[in-house]
Amino acid sequence: MRGIRKGHALALRVGTPAKINLWLEIVRKREDGYHDLSSLMLPVAVYDHVEVAWSHEGGVRLSCDSAEVPDDRGNLAWRAADAYLEAAGVTRGVSIRLEKNIPVGAGMGGGSSDAAAVLLALNRLSENPLSEAVLHRLAVGLGADVPFFLHCVPALATGIGERLLPVHGIPDYPLLLVKPPISVSTGWVYGSLKLTRGESRIKLRSFLDRPWHLSEVLRNDLETVTLNEYPQLGQIKCWLMENGAVGSLMSGSGPTVFGVFAEQRLADGAGELARRVWKDCRVDVTRVLGTPVSARS
């Protein structure tokens, strides 16, 4: 988080990382309509940038360099600022500038990451910052993925995603991300889901003992919906495995598919080939982030 001067006002500029789900198990559907889950969430070095400053004008003003992103209450970052102002009793306005690089509707948490960044930036700018517990409550109210991005460290998410257990010892996996030119509605995917497990089957301790034995943990119950609707995603998964990945999975509700590689040079080489083979897709070669310092630089 970096402070910059704009006239007499101090603005904060924040790099907001994406995420992948190394596994995503849907445990049960709750009476309130939400789903309990178990997921290992990992921050990834693909970033949006968010600039936040107090404004003399009331309310929230948001601008973005992408036409895909709304500039009003339809934007999660806008709602994050509005929620913070109400919780903190602040009467000043907020100005937000988004620079989008994380694909929209990709299953990579871009909107949630931006929202968490706004909460953190406003708390840093505030003369009377809110407690961590209040920030967490605000984040939960905004969306299930937002609490994860308050800390941006590998974490086991349970409940609807609001209960987070930081996980140490995760390798900085080299990654190749491939996103077809489609967007997927998370609400549609969950609404179409039929499978529920009843309990989590993946054991965190066993995974940490053998973090490169990915075939034992790469599971995403939402694939049963998204891959059925978009067969290309299954083709990309197979292609990644045929071209050097040690594991491949759809992230979140999709449509982004990631491949995990044993070495960065192998991911780089596969990335060059992917750009030629999957010409209509967004391709990123990146890695998992292991510390909050690197994730929030």
Swiss-Prot record:
The keyword Kinase applies. Gene3D superfamilies: 3.30.230.10, GHMP kinase, C-terminal domain. InterPro entries: GHMP_kinase_C_dom, GHMP_kinase_C_sf, GHMP_kinase_N_dom, IspE, Ribosomal_Su5_D2-typ_SF, Ribsml_uS5_D2-typ_fold_subgr. ATP binds at residues 103-113. It catalyses: 4-CDP-2-C-methyl-D-erythritol + ATP = 4-CDP-2-C-methyl-D-erythritol 2-phosphate + ADP + H(+). The keyword Glycosyltransferase does not apply. Pathway: Isoprenoid biosynthesis; isopentenyl diphosphate biosynthesis via DXP pathway; isopentenyl diphosphate from 1-deoxy-D-xylulose 5-phosphate: step 3/6. Keywords: ATP-binding, Isoprene biosynthesis, Kinase, Nucleotide-binding, Transferase. GO terms for biological process: isopentenyl diphosphate biosynthetic process, methylerythritol 4-phosphate pathway; terpenoid biosynthetic process. Its EC number is 2.7.1.148. It comes from the Bacteria. The active site is at residues 19, 145. GO terms for molecular function: 4-(cytidine 5'-diphospho)-2-C-methyl-D-erythritol kinase activity; ATP binding. Catalyzes the phosphorylation of the position 2 hydroxy group of 4-diphosphocytidyl-2C-methyl-D-erythritol. Belongs to the GHMP kinase family. IspE subfamily. NCBIfam families: ispE. This is 4-diphosphocytidyl-2-C-methyl-D-erythritol kinase. The lineage of its organism: Bacteria, Pseudomonadati, Thermodesulfobacteriota, Syntrophobacteria, Syntrophobacterales.
